[in-house]
């Protein structure tokens, strides 16, 4: 055999494990990998070194695997491309599970690589060895146990092609899992046998020439089904890669059909309101008024993606008998109402929309009149309550945060206040929320992942969500960018004050509301995070109109959850009593 090609790429020749791991890293880089989050460990050392030392990878070390998983989730949400996670063997990978679940449920691409003990050290109490096969159950879109590293060109080709398969599966939108068993030596100790084999056998650049990057499959234009004139479009939580194209498609659809658009707060539509004149943002509150609830019944519904967060809307749709067309390229069932639904397996941008524009109908005008009346009632109500109510905070943020700001919204009360009180605007902000599994875990870490290498970003969160993931502050030194945390501290779970459980008796406060006694100023100081207590609306506006460019800052706002719940209930009662002619 002739002389092998020179090694001119990031292939580590020191020993078998470094060679194998660097081939895996280089394969993923060629496929498009840019970011990897690495958790510390010994068994994963060959993988960590290969990915961390690759010149084209942004490698981020994070101590806590749970926090790391959510950071990767946030980075993948913002970049719309797979982010890799690497950890050691044992329970380390299990800590990725909550983020993997959220990634699966919300269609976010993650590439999870867990190091493992070799087969002979499993099921024999060798230590730090658990069953890592199917570690994530049904939540991995695809998974594989990789072969033990071997000096064999055929097996290196297998490794390269398995990497390509994993990447293509992740691009479907969700997590994939590769489990990599490794034998000693785990340190990059030089092995002459590996170097000799490489000198004789390595094919050089030709090895990666066979690696094919994913080619986007062109979507076939989907014609609209026959639809009546009295219908509506709902848009659930979504952060599309091209917000302007997404908004344009829905605006064209609305114009052609003459239908109103009921958009969740976490979509681009409320940030591009000037593009969508039939946008309805206060539908949850409109449907609390009995006359509107009865008179606004549609003859058909186009549901874009998931249903909006609003429970009121979902209950109302359950009462309808009309067909509902669900537009989503994902194959899951997006009908939790179990109604007369039909799946259109495309993106909304792929719908063939005729150029004709429908005139405004009485039905559409009714929705617009209701929207105007409700927004006026909200403004009047907020003018009568003190500074820094939770509804007022949501409204102020929608009015005063800089244009194009990326915003991550915590679950529980914050996302509902955005749904009710966030003003539609034309500020082109990007809103995100973990509405796959709807948990509060990983809130801070996900927000930091979104802020990394991004515009100065904002997290809107309650105290419990922040405390649940306070380890995320450890990522402060890794963050390339800035995150402002708007901390709405109402000393417990404010959402439960709006639910019947609030009347359960003495168990409510300690076991449901679960107030915590934490000095947030001291907590921020311990992590080296900037802290500012906010006491007035004027202070909040001044603090958010211009955002810093680096580091993490907490703006601490104190609210009373019982008073805020009472104000919301009073507003809901006012809206239910609005005269029907409004």
Curated annotation (Swiss-Prot):
CDD domains, A to Z: TPP_PYR_MenD, TPP_SHCHC_synthase
Cofactor entry: Mg(2+); Mn(2+); thiamine diphosphate
Cofactor: binding details: Binds 1 thiamine pyrophosphate per subunit.
Key word Methyltransferase present: no
Pathway terms, separated by semicolons: Quinol/quinone metabolism; 1,4-dihydroxy-2-naphthoate biosynthesis; 1,4-dihydroxy-2-naphthoate from chorismate: step 2/7; Cofactor biosynthesis; phylloquinone biosynthesis
Molecular function (Gene Ontology), one example: 2-succinyl-5-enolpyruvyl-6-hydroxy-3-cyclohexene-1-carboxylic-acid synthase activity
Catalytic activity: isochorismate + 2-oxoglutarate + H(+) = 5-enolpyruvoyl-6-hydroxy-2-succinyl-cyclohex-3-ene-1-carboxylate + CO2
EC number assigned by the record: 2.2.1.9
Sorted UniProt keywords: Magnesium, Manganese, Metal-binding, Thiamine pyrophosphate, Transferase
Root EC class: transferase
GO BP terms in the entry: menaquinone biosynthetic process; phylloquinone biosynthetic process
Pfam families: TPP_enzyme_C, TPP_enzyme_M_2, TPP_enzyme_N
Signal peptide start-end: none
Function: Catalyzes the thiamine diphosphate-dependent decarboxylation of 2-oxoglutarate and the subsequent addition of the resulting succinic semialdehyde-thiamine pyrophosphate anion to isochorismate to yield 2-succinyl-5-enolpyruvyl-6-hydroxy-3-cyclohexene-1-carboxylate (SEPHCHC).
Similarity annotation: Belongs to the TPP enzyme family. MenD subfamily.
Assembly description: Homodimer.
Name of the molecule in the record: 2-succinyl-5-enolpyruvyl-6-hydroxy-3-cyclohexene-1-carboxylate synthase
Species assigned in the record: Synechococcus elongatus (strain ATCC 33912 / PCC 7942 / FACHB-805) (Anacystis nidulans R2)
């Amino acid at each position: 055999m002739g002389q092998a090609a020179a090694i001119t790429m990031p292939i580590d020749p020191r020993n078998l494990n470094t060679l194998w791991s660097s081939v895996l890293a280089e394969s993923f880089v060629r496929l498009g990998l840019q970011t990897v989050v690495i958790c510390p460990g010994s068994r994963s050392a060959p993988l960590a070194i290969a990915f961390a030392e690759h010149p084209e990878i942004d490698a981020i070390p994070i101590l806590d695997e749970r926090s790391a998983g959510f950071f990767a989730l946030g980075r993948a949400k913002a970049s719309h491309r797979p982010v890799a996670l690497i950890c050691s063997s044992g329970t380390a990978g299990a800590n990725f599970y909550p983020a993997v679940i959220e990634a699966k449920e919300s269609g976010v691409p993650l590439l999870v690589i867990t190091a493992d003990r070799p087969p002979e050290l499993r099921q024999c109490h060798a230590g730090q060895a658990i069953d890592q096969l199917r570690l994530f159950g049904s939540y991995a879109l695809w998974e594989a146990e990789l072969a033990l590293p071997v000096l064999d060109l055929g097996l290196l080709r297998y490794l390269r092609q398995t990497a390509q398969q994993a990447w293509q599966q992740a691009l479907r939108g969700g997590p994939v899992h590769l489990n990599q068993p490794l034998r000693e030596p785990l340190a990059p100790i030089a092995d002459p046998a590996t170097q000799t084999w490489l000198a004789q056998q390595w094919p050089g650049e030709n090895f990666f020439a066979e690696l094919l990057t994913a080619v986007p499959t062109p979507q076939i234009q989907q014609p609209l089904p026959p639809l009546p004139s009295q219908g509506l479009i709902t848009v659930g939580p979504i952060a599309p890669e091209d917000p302007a194209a997404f908004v344009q498609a829905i605006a064209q659809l609305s114009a052609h059909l003459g239908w109103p658009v009921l958009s969740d707060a976490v979509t681009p539509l409320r940030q591009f309101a000037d593009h969508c004149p039939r946008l309805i943002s206060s539908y949850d509150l409109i449907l609390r008024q009995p006359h509107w609830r009865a008179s606004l019944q549609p003859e058909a519904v186009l549901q874009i993606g998931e249903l909006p967060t609003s429970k009121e809307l979902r209950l109302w749709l359950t009462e309808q008998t009309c067909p509902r067309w669900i537009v989503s390229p994902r194959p899951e069932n997006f009908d939790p109402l179990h109604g007369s639904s039909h799946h259109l397996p495309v993106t909304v941008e792929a719908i063939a929309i005729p150029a004709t524009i429908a005139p405004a109908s009485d039905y559409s005008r009714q929705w617009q009149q209701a929207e105007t009346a409700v927004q006026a009632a909200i403004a009047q109500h907020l003018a009568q309550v003190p500074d820094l109510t939770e509804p007022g905070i949501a409204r102020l943020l929608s009015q005063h945060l800089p244009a194009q700001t990326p915003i991550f919204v915590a679950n529980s009360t914050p996302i509902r206040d955005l749904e009710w009180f966030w003003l539609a605007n034309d500020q082109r902000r990007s809103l995100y929320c973990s509405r796959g599994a709807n948990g509060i875990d990983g809130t801070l870490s996900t927000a930091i992942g979104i802020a990394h290498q991004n515009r100065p970003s904002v997290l809107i969160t309650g105290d419990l969500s922040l405390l649940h993931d306070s380890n995320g502050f450890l990522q402060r030194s890794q963050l390339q960018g800035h995150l402002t945390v708007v901390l709405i501290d109402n000393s417990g779970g404010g959402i439960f004050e709006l639910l019947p459980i609030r009347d359960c008796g003495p168990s409510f406060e300690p076991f449901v509301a679960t107030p915590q006694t934490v000095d947030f100023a001291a907590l921020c100081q311990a992590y080296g995070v900037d802290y500012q207590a906010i006491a007035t609306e004027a202070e909040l506006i001044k603090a958010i109109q211009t955002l810093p460019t680096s580091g993490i800052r907490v703006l601490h706002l104190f609210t009373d959850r019982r008073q805020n719940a009472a104000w919301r209930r009073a507003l809901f009662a006012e809206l239910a009593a609005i005269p029907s002619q409004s």
